[in-house]
Regions:
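Non-ligating segments of multi-cofactor redox enzymes
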Residues: 1-64, 74-76, 82-85, 90-182
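Phosphate/diphosphate ligand-binding glycine-rich loop within oxidoreductases
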Residues: 68
């Protein structure tokens, strides 16, 4: 038995190694590997769906003035891919990158800034502009189908919830909804 083991060991020395020489040679990630989330700031609409589903609280939202900042902190990320699943704009994609260690802390943070739409009446910021534009694009065909003027609809939705309660604008919105629901 010992003799056979020694012979196999000597043969193995001259064959190719069984393991790769990581970290000196890159190791490919397996298929389906969930690595670092990559965020495309051009696609992000600022809806915050990713922050709402992040169980590790690695994604935060902060509204300051007329801007919304969404911050991604990879140090807390569990690579669950929930942010990728819920993003309506497909702005978040998980890469196959797994070597995330770095001495620079700023390498663990990604910030995306999105402008907020201000209310037509009071001027308070209340919804991300790209999110509203995406929503209007999605309902444009439906509005045309029911002969509803898209500009009139835009005026209704560009009023914050507080002002909407105070004016008759909500009645116009209800009428539009009633026409669409028939």
């Amino acid at each position: 038995m010992k003799e056979r083991t020694i012979i196999e060991t000597i043969k193995a020395l001259f064959k190719r190694p069984f393991t790769i020489k990581y970290p000196y040679e890159p190791s490919p990630a397996p298929e389906g590997f969930r690595g670092k989330p990559e965020v495309d700031p051009e696609k992000c609409i600022g809806c915050g769906a990713c922050a709402r589903v992040c169980s590790a609280e690695g994604i935060t939202i902060e509204d300051k003035g007329a801007e919304r900042t969404i911050s991604y902190f990879y140090g807390k990320c569990t690579f669950c891919a929930r942010c990728e699943e819920v993003c309506p704009a497909e702005a978040v994609k998980l890469s196959r990158e797994f070597e995330l260690s770095d001495y620079d802390k700023s390498a663990f943070y990604v910030k995306v800034t999105v402008p907020l739409l201000t209310c037509r009446i009071c001027g308070a910021p209340f919804v991300p502009k790209p999110q509203l534009e995406m929503g209007l694009e999605k309902v444009a065909d439906l509005l045309k189908k029911y002969n509803i003027d898209i500009e009139k609809f835009r005026q209704i939705v560009e009023v914050c919830p507080n002002c909407r309660r105070k004016i008759e604008n909500i009645e116009a919105g209800r009428k539009i909804l009633m026409v669409m629901m028939k």
